[in-house]
Regions:
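Glycine-rich phosphate-binding loop used to anchor ATP phosphates in small-molecule kinases
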Residues: 45, 115-174, 221-238, 253
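Conserved NTP phosphate-binding and transfer environment spanning the P-loop NTPase/kinase superfamily
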Residues: 17-22, 29, 166-307
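Conserved glycine(s) of the Walker
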Residues: 58
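Charged, amphipathic alpha-helical linker segments immediately N-terminal to NTP-binding catalytic cores
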Residues: 1-37
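Hydrophobic positions on the alpha1 helix immediately C-terminal to the Walker A/P-loop
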Residues: 61-66, 81
Length: 307
C-alpha cells in the first residue's frame, strides 16, 4: 500500500501542477497496460473479464480504458455495468440496513438477479443478449437498451461491486480473468493521522453523487456507513479471488476533491465525524488547491467523479 504525505501533495500541487498531474496519470496508465497484457494473453481461454471493487474505485472508467487498450491489440471488448441491472424503484421492497437505519442500496437484492444470471449464461454460450440501462436520476430500469454478443477475438468486461460473488456469477468464474480495483493508498497528515483508502473514496463518491446522481453531500454522508457495511458484506469476502489488482488513486485528486468538500460543508464539519471520517475534517482547510484543468487528460479516471 502506497503512502503519501499531505506535505508532499501540497508541494507538488503548488510547485509544478503539470508534472504532478502527468506523473499520477502515468502511474495509473502503466498499471492498466500490465493488466491488459494479462487479459490479452488469456482471452481465448477466458473471454470474460470481471472488474470488482468498492464504491468509487473508478470501475467504469478503468473498464473503458482497458477496453481501448485491448482494441489496439486486436481484441474487441464489450462493456457491461452491473449497475444497469438494478431494478426500478417501487417495484420491490428495498432491503433495510438495521445497523445504520437506512436502505441497503448495496444489497444484491436490489438487482434483477434472474435477468443477470440468464444474460451471463447466454453470453458465454455465444447467444445475443439485450442489456438494460438504469437511470439513476429517476431510478428506473430501461429494458432492451442494446445488444451484446460474443464473437471470435472478442471479450466481455463486466464491472460491478458484486462481480466476484459466486452466488450471483455462478460458473462464470472459470471463464473469467478477475481484476480488483480500489484506492489502495493512504494519505498521512502533518501529525501522522491516517486518511485511509475508504476516506479517499468517500471524497470521490460525494462529488460524483452531487454532480451526477442528484444527491447532496449530506445524503452521501448519511449513507456512507451503510456503503461501508455493504463492502464488508458483499466485496471483502471475495477480494482474494482477484487475479490482478489496480490502485486507481491519483494523489492530485485530493487537492481537487477536498476543495469541493470544504465548500459544501461550511459549518457542518461534525457530519464527517459522525460518518467515521474525522481525519478528513482535520485537513479540510489544509489542502492546497491545484490548477489541474489544463493538464488532466480527457480519459482520466477522475472524470467519472468530477465531470
Amino acid at each position: 500500500m502506497a503512502e503519501y504525505t499531505l506535505k508532499y501533495i501540497n508541494h507538488r500541487a503548488e510547485c509544478d501542477a503539470e508534472a504532478f498531474v502527468n506523473d499520477c496519470e502515468e502511474h495509473y496508465h502503466r498499471q492498466l497496460h500490465l493488466v491488459a497484457d494479462q487479459i490479452a494473453a488469456n482471452c481465448k481461454r477466458k473471454p470474460v473479464v470481471l472488474l470488482n471493487g468498492p464504491s468509487s474505485s473508478g470501475k467504469t472508467t478503468t473498464n473503458d480504458r482497458l477496453g481501448r487498450i485491448l482494441e489496439l491489440a486486436g481484441i474487441h471488448a464489450h462493456m457491461i455495468s452491473m449497475d444497469d441491472y438494478y431494478r426500478t424503484s417501487g417495484t420491490y421492497d428495498i432491503p433495510f440496513d438495521e445497523e445504520n437505519g437506512v436502505n441497503d442500496l448495496e444489497s444484491p437484492e436490489c438487482m434483477d438477479l434472474d435477468l443477470l444470471r440468464d444474460h451471463l449464461t447466454r453470453l458465454v454460450a455465444g447467444e445475443e443478449i439485450m442489456v438494460p440501462r438504469f437511470d439513476f436520476e429517476t431510478r428506473t430500469s430501461h429494458r432492451n437498451d442494446r445488444a451484446v454478443q460474443l464473437h471470435k477475438d472478442e471479450i466481455v468486461m463486466i464491472e460491478g461491486i458484486h462481480a466476484f460473488n459466486p452466488v450471483i456469477m455462478g460458473d462464470l468464474e472459470k471463464h473469467a480473468t478477475s481484476v480488483y480495483l480500489s484506492v489502495a493508498s493512504v494519505l498521512l497528515t502533518d501529525h501522522n493521522v491516517r486518511v485511509e483508502p475508504h476516506m479517499l473514496r468517500f471524497l470521490r463518491r460525494a462529488m460524483r453523487d452531487s454532480l451526477f446522481r442528484s444527491s447532496p453531500v449530506e445524503h452521501t454522508l448519511k449513507q456512507w456507513n451503510s456503503v461501508r457495511r455493504g463492502e464488508r458484506l458483499y466485496i471483502s469476502p471475495y477480494r482474494g479471488q482477484a487475479d490482478l489488482t489496480v490502485d486507481t488513486y491519483l494523489p492530485y485528486e485530493t487537492n481537487i476533491l477536498m476543495q469541493y468538500l470544504s465548500e459544501k460543508l461550511q459549518g457542518e464539519e461534525k457530519m464527517l465525524e459522525q460518518a467515521d471520517l474525522a481525519p478528513l475534517s482535520a485537513i479540510l482547510d489544509k489542502v492546497s488547491p491545484i490548477d489541474y484543468k489544463p493538464y488532466m487528460p480527457e480519459d482520466s479516471v477522475l472524470h467519472e467523479f468530477i465531470g
